[in-house]
């Protein structure tokens, strides 16, 4: 499915660039065309996967030359904000669904993929409807194609939990009790790095979903209607504050990937992480600590106006430039 995803996206970018007369350039007498592809996966194992799919596409389409550029997560975000509106915009690039990409849409910088999906029923049918919702606007415009689903879970060190006599928590009160026991046993309860600021938003955003109703959040998360006056947001911050004493020291000065390393090396009994981070932990060839004995559990329940059983998750995907 992913091989087809890349192939069809590349073909879509090719057709779109020829239609607009932009980005697609002649580089030889044989009119070899260039597609610029920008992604945020310079590390293994993802980089090799992308390189393999691109090599396959170029072999099957000798008239196409794909120029690839990649960058780590946070530098990627900053560069993308600069290049998307410029003359050197990549034809295909990774982008997060929601407001991160929708601001580009409001500036007419993202191609509407709806007609391309309608013209290729096999491609359309291969995509999960539940994931496509996140890359579809209210008016029906499909602006991106997901290639994997991400979710947030607490990763925990099984050995440290057992040594401290801690059970997997299912409620927030149980989570705080677990943190106290781990701390008393000499362990850092939660490995945390908030240097880039987004890790805090993942905690608070998850808690918001439990303390604020879906209807209110939908209104507030829309730029034109957001007010953020619901008391549930204050409650969420208060819950988050209860966790702060159990984070490692200097958490705002530590990068998120360093927090992951700390967890992998035993310097943190828990780590609120994305499931896509698993290969960085236990991949036999590239993982930080392939022998780490760890498990996972969802963010413990909080009774509030929202959904106590919520699991924070979102698909990740690619979009095509309209330039």
Task: Briefly describe each language-model feature range.
Residues 97-153, 176, 202-205, 232, ...:
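Hinge/lid segment of periplasmic solute-binding proteins
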Residues 179-182, 222-252:
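Glycine-centered hinge/linker elements that transmit conformational signals in sensory
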Residues 114-127, 211-235, 284-289, 301-309:
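Short, solvent-exposed loop/beta-turn-alpha elements that line the ligand-binding surface or hinge
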Residues 138-147, 152, 176-225, 268:
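Extracytoplasmic/periplasmic solute-binding protein
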Residues 56-127, 134, 159, 163-170, ...:
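Extracytoplasmic "Venus flytrap"/periplasmic binding protein-like
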Residues 31-42, 64-69, 91-92, 143, ...:
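Short, well-ordered beta-strand elements
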Residues 33, 55-60, 65, 86, ...:
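Extracytoplasmic/periplasmic substrate-recognition and gating elements
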Residues 1-36, 59, 117:
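Short, low-complexity disordered leader/linker segments with a strong preference
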């Amino acid at each position: 499915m992913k091989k087809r995803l890349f192939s069809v996206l590349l073909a879509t970018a090719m057709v779109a660039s020829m239609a607009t007369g932009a980005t697609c350039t002649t580089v030889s007498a044989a009119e070899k065309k260039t597609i610029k592809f920008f992604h945020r996966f310079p590390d293994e194992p993802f980089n090799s996967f992308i390189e393999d799919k691109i090599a396959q596409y170029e072999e099957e389409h000798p008239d196409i030359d794909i120029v690839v550029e990649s960058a780590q997560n946070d530098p990627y975000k900053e560069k993308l904000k600069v290049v998307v509106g410029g003359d050197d915009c990549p034809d295909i690039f990774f982008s997060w669904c929601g407001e991160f990409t929708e601001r580009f849409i409001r500036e007419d910088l993202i191609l509407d993929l709806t007609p391309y999906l309608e013209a290729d029923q096999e491609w359309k049918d291969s995509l999960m409807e539940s994931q496509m919702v996140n890359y579809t606007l209210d008016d029906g415009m499909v602006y991106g194609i997901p290639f994997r689903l991400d979710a947030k879970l607490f990763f925990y060190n099984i050995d440290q939990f057992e040594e401290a006599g801690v059970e997997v928590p299912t409620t927030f009160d149980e989570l705080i009790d677990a943190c106290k026991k781990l701390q008393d046993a000499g362990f850092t309860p939660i490995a945390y790095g908030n240097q880039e600021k987004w890790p805090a938003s993942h905690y608070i955003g998850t808690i918001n979903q439990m303390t604020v109703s879906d209807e209110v959040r939908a209104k507030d998360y829309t730029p034109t209607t957001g007010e953020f006056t619901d008391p549930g947001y204050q409650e969420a911050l208060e819950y988050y504050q209860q966790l702060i004493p159990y984070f490692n020291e200097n958490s705002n000065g530590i990068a998120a990937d360093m927090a992951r390393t700390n967890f992998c090396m035993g310097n943190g009994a828990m780590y609120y992480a994305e499931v896509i981070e698993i290969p960085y932990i236990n991949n036999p060839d590239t993982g930080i600590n392939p022998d780490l004995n760890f498990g996972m559990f969802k963010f413990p329940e909080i009774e509030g106006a929202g959904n106590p059983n919520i699991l924070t998750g979102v698909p990740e995907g690619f979009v095509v430039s309209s330039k």
